[in-house]
Amino acid sequence: KFVPISCPMPTNRQPKSLVVNINENSVKKMPWFTNXXTYFGXT
């Protein structure tokens, strides 16, 4: 499932949006999947 992410990211580049392929079950286990934004450790 592709989820559009719109959020400021702690990186030099701050893309307005990016698409990340994630697993819903995995998302529930992600402690950093929370308000404001979502940082997928990526660049």
From Swiss-Prot:
Protein name: Canavanine hydrolase
Lineage: Eukaryota, Metazoa, Ecdysozoa, Arthropoda, Hexapoda
Quaternary structure note: Hexamer, composed of two different subunits.
Highest taxon of the lineage: Eukaryota
Hydrolase found in the keyword field: yes
Functional description taken from the UniProt entry: Irreversibly hydrolyzes L-canavanine to L-homoserine and hydroxyguanidine. Has no activity on L-2-amino-5-(guanidinooxy)pentanoate or L-2-amino-3-(guanidinooxy)propionate, or on the L-canavanine derivatives methyl-L-canavanine, L-canaline or O-ureido-L-homoserine.
Enzyme class label: hydrolase
Keywords: Hydrolase
Known EC number: 3.-.-.-
Membrane-spanning ranges: none
Entry keyword annotation includes Hydrolase: yes
Organism: Heliothis virescens
GO molecular function: hydrolase activity
